[in-house]
């Protein structure tokens, strides 16, 4: 890595995580000068270890797929999902039609460093341990960033000017939170996660083509869910996600019964009690040993009203975050990184106006966010009312039908082959809509907990009449259908999907936008 931050650059990227590194890598391969500032020194710890098969498509575009295949990360053949103890778990099979369609479970510190090193080798100037303190805007064009002030732990400071900015600063979201102030939290998905690492655990479906698949299971008290993700270093990440209100209530009740315990002791005891509410997980833990260290984070879902403006783009968690369910984070980071790179290249090369390019990027991020939001809301609606008929009918034994219906979303670019039809995409959207619109129906084993369901229907899909509401409904439906199409194949859909009258020219050396 280089050490002296220059005083100017053509394209500046804030953040060396997946969104920033990917955008930088795509842009430098187009022949542009790219500088990247990262506040941490890699490797650094990060949560988010389960991948989608769509990653292969993105990594292939920057010639990194073979590095991933040869590194030694644990192959991920699919994922198991259990939302009702009376029914068999559902399974999303990544490799049913193609053994090469598997994803990976990764140690993020290693994967993120592998990606950052790869783009540095491609020509990106990377500066680690470099914080961004302030972004400066043009006096003539107040919404256009033109330079920033950086600093390091050794007290050195400086300024760097640029023509283009990609904000991939993670959840801090500098542009969105500090300057645009356009971030909105989704009250339906205010959750908290607590996780730790275990050794000596069992594996899901050992000896079959499902071995090493992660396990996701709803808690029997309907307050949240757990994850079980095996890793190549011999550890397994076991996490608990609770609705924030339920987490607070459980902690308060526990403290009332166990006065004098420290916060760390309460957190540990609550974690151990919550995982007991996932019988399938207990079987997978077997005789495994917990390493004794817990970590926690607020999994608050949020989005922004826009993700671009004059000469800047926002990508990854800097703009939006949904939920850890379905491992959408890095897929959305890569989508945002590629869109940022495509639209910057298009603007530089005169394929369109800068306003048209920035609007394309914002629309791309919004549709990607909408896709996963619909599915995650449906999952939470079911796990909060487990005896209700939401994702499955009363006589169904598992989630398999629902998973098949949602295949274009939850597998990323995997099983959704290049022949995916408009009818199949519409069926997926219709399924999502029906889940969000229908009232939960008790199936005889219990009453629906409608008051506990935290997933309201998106306003544009709720029932009601009137020309304005009907028009908004059609707009969201069309946007969502486009977002489902983009799950097919990142190169194929980026090169064919029309957004705001443009589609992407997915060809290295001439990357940009083409008017439809």
Swiss-Prot record:
Keywords: FAD, Flavoprotein, Monooxygenase, Oxidoreductase. It catalyses: melleolide F + FADH2 + chloride + O2 = 6'-chloromelleolide F + FAD + 2 H2O + H(+). GO terms for molecular function: flavin-dependent halogenase activity; monooxygenase activity. Residues 440-475 are annotated as: Disordered. Its EC number is 1.14.19.-. FAD binds at residues 16, 19, 49, 330. Coiled coil: none annotated. Disulfide bonds: none annotated. Melleolide sesquiterpene aryl esters are cytotoxic secondary products with anti-cancer potential. Armillaridin shows therapeutic and radiosensitizing effects on human esophageal cancer cells. Armillaridin induces autophagy-associated cell death in human chronic myelogenous leukemia as well as of hepatocellular carcinoma cells. Armillaridin can also inhibit the differentiation and activation of human macrophages and thus might have potential to be developed as a biological response modifier for inflammatory diseases. It comes from the Eukaryota. One of its GO terms (biological process) is secondary metabolite biosynthetic process. Chloride binds at residues 328-329. It is an enzyme of class 1 (oxidoreductase). InterPro entries: FAD/NAD-bd_sf, Flavin-dep_Halogenase_NPB, Flavin_halogenase. Armillaria species are both devastating forest pathogens and some of the largest and oldest terrestrial organisms on Earth. They forage for hosts and achieve immense colony sizes via rhizomorphs, root-like multicellular structures of clonal dispersal. Belongs to the flavin-dependent halogenase family. Flavin-dependent halogenase involved in the biosynthesis of melleolides, a range of antifungal and phytotoxic polyketide derivatives composed of an orsellinic acid (OA) moiety esterified to various sesquiterpene alcohols. The halogenase catalyzes the transfer of a single chlorine atom to the melleolide backbone, resulting in a 6'-chloromelleolide product. The enzyme acts on free substrate and does not depend on carrier-protein-dependent acceptor molecules. This is Flavin-dependent halogenase armH2. The gene is armH2.
């Amino acid at each position: 890595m280089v050490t002296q931050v220059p005083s100017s650059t053509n394209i500046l990227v804030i953040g060396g995580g997946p969104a920033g590194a990917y955008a930088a890598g795509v842009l430098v391969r187009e022949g542009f000068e790219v500088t990247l500032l990262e506040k941490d020194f890699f490797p650094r710890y990060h949560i988010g270890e389960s991948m989608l098969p769509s990653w292969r498509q993105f990594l292939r575009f920057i010639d990194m797929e073979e590095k991933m295949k040869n590194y030694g990360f644990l192959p991920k053949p699919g994922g198991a999902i259990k939302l009702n103890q009376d029914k068999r778990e559902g399974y999303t099979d990544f490799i049913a039609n193609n053994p090469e369609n598997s994803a990976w479970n990764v140690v993020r510190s290693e994967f993120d460093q592998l990606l950052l090193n790869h783009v540095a080798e491609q020509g990106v100037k990377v500066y680690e341990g470099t914080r961004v303190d302030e972004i400066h805007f043009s006096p003539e064009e107040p919404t256009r960033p033109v330079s920033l002030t950086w600093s390091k732990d050794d007290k050195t400071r400086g300024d760097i000017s640029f023509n283009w900015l990609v904000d991939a600063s993670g959840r801090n979201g500098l542009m969105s939170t500090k300057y645009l102030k356009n971030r909105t939290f989704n009250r339906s998905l205010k959750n908290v996660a607590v996780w730790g690492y275990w050794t000596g655990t069992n594996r899901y479906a050992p000896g079959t083509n499902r071995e090493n698949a992660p396990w996701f299971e709803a808690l029997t008290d309907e307050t949240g869910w757990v994850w079980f993700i095996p890793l190549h270093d011999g550890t397994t990440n076991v996490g608990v996600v609770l609705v924030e209100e339920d987490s607070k209530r459980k902690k308060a009740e526990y403290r009332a019964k166990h006065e004098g315990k420290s916060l760390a002791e309460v957190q540990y005891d609550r974690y151990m009690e919550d995982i007991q509410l996932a019988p399938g997980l207990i079987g997978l833990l077997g005789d495994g040993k917990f390493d004794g260290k817990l970590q926690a984070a607020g999994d608050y879902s949020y989005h922004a009203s826009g993700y671009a403006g004059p000469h800047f783009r926002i990508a990854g968690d800097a703009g939006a975050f949904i939920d850890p369910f379905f491992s959408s984070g890095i897929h959305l980071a890569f989508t945002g990184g590629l869109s940022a790179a495509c639209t910057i290249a298009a603007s530089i090369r005169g394929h369109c106006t800068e306003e048209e390019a920035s609007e394309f990027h914002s629309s791309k991020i919004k549709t990607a966010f909408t896709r996963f939001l619909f599915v995650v809301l449906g999952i939470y609606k079911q796990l909060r009312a487990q005896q209700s008929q939401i994702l499955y009918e009363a006589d169904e034994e598992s989630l398999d039908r629902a998973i098949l219906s949602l295949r274009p979303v939850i597998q990323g670019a995997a099983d959704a082959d290049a022949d995916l039809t408009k009818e199949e995409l519409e069926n997926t959207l219709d399924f999502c809509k029906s889940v969000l619109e229908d009232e939960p129906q008790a199936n005889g084993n219990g009453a629906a907990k409608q008051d506990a369901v935290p997933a309201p229907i998106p306003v544009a899909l709720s029932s009601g009449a009137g020309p304005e509401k009907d028009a908004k409904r059609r707009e969201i439906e069309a946007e969502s259908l486009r977002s489902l199409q983009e799950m097919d194949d990142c190169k194929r859909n980026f090169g064919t999907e029309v957004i705001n009258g443009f589609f992407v020219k997915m060809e290295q050396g001439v990357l940009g936008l083409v008017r439809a």
